[in-house]
């Protein structure tokens, strides 16, 4: 997700001075597309998405707390997982709170500055998720294919470097998006066909030919769908053979369980992301394409803790030990006994 914006500069040009009257210059605000126009349905949707948002934040916070407080989880896999949880909190917090407030106030307005800010954080955290999922696939590859050298290869210095590298690439991607959008000086309309400031939707509003916009969207889908997934699938292609050679069924189950959870998250993240971007160019109804956007920005971060961690025995044991320490600190009996 970090390299394609550079190519945008070959496509994006300032709007010509002979623009037609319907083209708008100096736009100060945009109008977001709501999930429903029924005023009676707004409180129901607001309550639903508030519940999903709270589940997402609390679930990911539990993972971060469990990993940081338990020495048994101070391993590269859980270190990357806790950073993925942090990125998921930021990712969903970029769009969902604004959407809930809009539902409650029956407002669809977002300022130009607010739109660019939301877009920047959206790209930042989406790219962080993208990078971290790839890093986690590499971590599983090293753990299974090179178990004897795992601690040497995945040392704390390399783990920290991979996190910092992911962050700075994501930050660069975010700022390049900002620079690209600042090149747009006029728009055909102020209605964004999504519930947040999606970069692809903003490109649709610019004055130049929409054919280039559609090509850019397909290019984005190809780059950020095919290439990262290909890298992850290649890692798992290398992983399958060593797993099949594991002598014990328990060892095979543990390896497949870890890899299966990660692959489920990967498929959910990249699949809904690709569908969301491509459907915006294919489907005639904006509300139909918004279903994929909701899955991508709301449902996926909510399901990640359940898919990857909260069903993990190590995480459950860590949470149990943490609960026991909290109760002991209040001079009560521990919640559970861990032998």
From Swiss-Prot:
One of its GO terms (molecular function) is olfactory receptor activity. Glycans are attached at residue 23. Residues 1-43, 94-117, 179-215, 277-289 are extracellular. It is found in: Cell membrane. The chain crosses the membrane at residues 44-64, 73-93, 118-138, 158-178, 216-235, 256-276, 290-310. Keywords: Cell membrane, Disulfide bond, G-protein coupled receptor, Glycoprotein, Membrane, Olfaction, Receptor, Sensory transduction, Transducer, Transmembrane, Transmembrane helix. GO terms for biological process: signal transduction. GO terms for cellular component: plasma membrane. InterPro entries: GPCR_Rhodpsn, GPCR_Rhodpsn_7TM, Olfact_rcpt. It is a multi-pass membrane protein. Belongs to the G-protein coupled receptor 1 family. This is Olfactory receptor 7E24. It comes from Homo sapiens. The lineage of its organism: Eukaryota, Metazoa, Chordata, Craniata, Vertebrata. The gene is OR7E24.
């Amino acid at each position: 997700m970090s390299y394609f914006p550079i190519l945008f500069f070959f496509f994006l040009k300032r709007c010509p001075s002979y623009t037609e009257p319907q083209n708008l210059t100096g736009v100060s605000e945009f109008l977001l597309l709501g999930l429903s126009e029924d005023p009676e349905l707004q409180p129901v949707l607001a309550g639903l998405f508030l519940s999903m948002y709270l589940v997402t934040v609390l679930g990911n916070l539990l993972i971060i707390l469990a990993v940081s407080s338990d020495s048994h989880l101070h391993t590269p896999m859980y270190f990357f997982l806790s950073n993925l949880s942090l990125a998921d909190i930021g990712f969903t917090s970029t769009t969902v709170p604004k959407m809930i407030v809009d539902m409650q106030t029956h407002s669809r307005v977002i300022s130009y500055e607010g739109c660019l800010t939301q877009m920047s954080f959206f790209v930042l955290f989406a790219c962080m998720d993208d990078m971290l999922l790839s890093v986690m696939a590499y971590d599983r590859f090293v753990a299974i294919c090179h178990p004897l050298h795992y601690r040497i290869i995945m040392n704390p210095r390399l783990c920290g470097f991979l996190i910092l590298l992911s962050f700075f690439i994501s930050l660069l991607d975010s700022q390049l998006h900002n620079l690209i959008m600042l090149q747009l000086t006029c728009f055909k309309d102020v209605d964004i066909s999504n519930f947040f400031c999606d970069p692809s939707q903003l490109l649709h509003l610019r004055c130049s030919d929409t054919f280039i916009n559609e090509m850019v969207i397909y290019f984005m889908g190809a780059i950020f769908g095919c290439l990262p997934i290909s890298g992850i699938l290649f890692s798992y292609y290398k992983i399958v053979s060593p797993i099949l050679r594991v002598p014990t069924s328990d060892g095979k189950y543990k390896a497949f369980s870890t890899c299966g959870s990660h692959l489920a998250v990967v498929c959910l993240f990249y699949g809904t992301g690709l569908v969301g971007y491509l459907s915006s160019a294919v489907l005639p109804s904006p509300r139909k394409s918004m279903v994929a956007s909701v899955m991508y920005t709301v449902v996926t971060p909510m399901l990640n803790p359940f898919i990857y961690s909260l069903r993990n025995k190590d995480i459950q044991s860590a949470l149990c030990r943490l609960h026991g320490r909290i109760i002991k600190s209040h001079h009560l009996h521990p919640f559970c006994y861990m032998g």
